[in-house]
Structures are given as structure tokens and as C-alpha cells.
Regions:
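Contiguous mid-protein beta-loop-alpha structural module that forms a pocket-lining wall or clamp
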Residues: 1-12, 24
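Outer-membrane beta-barrel pore domains
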Residues: 12, 16-18, 23-179
């Protein structure tokens, strides 16, 4: 039974600048009878700038109550930034958008992420042997493009190139597509 409670606030400072803040509070997440993720509140604050109708830059600072593995020097604070150009609209076939993002987020600030880098076990797929135990966080970039194929049908392609923010022995590249 996984529950996450949160509060997200957004404020348009003016026509170009906007601010956001959020607070997230999870209940402990269990993997069978074992606690897979402890309760750890996360706070975020971000600032965005709209250059024009098509281009937006947004950066966010994230901080957790405590690091996941403090005894190993894992961090509890990080940041992320994203630059968006245009953007596909579900009600506008033929519309498209692209973005680039950079993340430096310790495991303590991530509850779930598309890249699936923040895992507690990683395996060598050739031998199915465990390589690393411990949470990794994410540090690296993501690029993506989306295109509206038909009304309410959007295709997306994302590429991730990450290493662990807390454990840089973990590296991953991944392509992700959606329709």
C-alpha cells in the first residue's frame, strides 16, 4: 500500500516569471514485509522564465528531511533544470515540442522516476548477477521530443544518460517511447 501526500503551489510573478513550491509526504513503502523506502518528506522550490510563447526555462531546488544512506555520505539536497521549446498539444494534431533537462538529485529526493535509475538493486543482464545494492539517485541529462499524431494521441521519445548522484558507479543510458 503506497501512499504519497503532497501540496503544490504555483504563482505567476508576472507575464515572464513564475514560481512554484511543493511539499511531499510519503508513507513507508513496503516490498512484501520489508520496508523498501522509509518516510522522508521532500520540499521543492522552483523558478521559471518564459522567454516567449515557445521557450521556457525552469529550475528547481529539492531537499529531503534526511539522506537515504547517511553512513555512506549520501546527500539530501539536489536540483534539476529543464529547457522546453514549443510543446505538443493533445487537441492540436501536428503540434510538437522538444526539451532538454539536467538532474542532480540524490535518492532521498526521488519517489519514482521514469528513468528507473533510483533502484535498490541493479543487475548485469547478461549474467543476472547483482552489481550494486543501494540507492543511486540520478545525475545526468535527458532529451525528449513529442508529437501529436491525432486528436488525443501523442507520441513521445525520450533519451536518458545518467549516473548515480549518490553512487556514481551506477551508469545508465535508456531510450523511452510512448504512444
Amino acid at each position: 500500500n503506497e501512499k504519497l501526500y503532497g501540496l503544490h503551489l504555483a504563482y505567476p510573478v508576472n507575464k515572464k516569471i513564475f514560481a512554484q513550491a511543493a511539499y511531499y509526504h510519503p508513507e513507508a513503502i513496503y516490498d512484501g514485509n520489508t520496508v523498501a523506502y522509509q518516510k522522508n518528506d521532500v520540499y521543492t522550490v522552483g523558478l521559471g522564465y518564459k522567454f516567449d510563447k515557445s521557450t521556457i526555462l525552469y529550475a528547481e531546488y529539492l531537499k529531503a528531511d534526511k539522506p537515504v544512506l547517511p553512513e555512506q555520505g549520501y546527500s539530501k539536497a539536489g536540483w534539476a533544470a529543464r529547457l522546453d521549446y514549443k510543446g505538443a498539444k493533445y487537441n492540436n494534431p501536428g503540434s510538437w515540442g522538444t526539451y532538454v533537462a539536467y538532474y542532480d538529485q540524490p535518492a532521498a529526493t526521488i519517489y519514482d522516476h521514469t528513468s528507473e535509475m533510483d533502484v535498490n538493486k541493479m543487475y548485469d543482464t547478461r549474467t543476472n548477477r547483482e552489481l550494486v545494492t543501494g540507492y543511486a539517485g540520478i545525475k545526468g541529462y535527458e532529451i525528449g521530443v513529442n508529437y501529436t499524431v491525432a486528436r488525443n494521441v501523442m507520441a513521445a521519445f525520450n533519451y536518458f544518460d545518467y549516473q548515480g548522484a549518490d553512487n556514481n558507479n551506477i551508469k545508465d543510458r535508456m531510450m523511452w517511447t510512448q504512444l
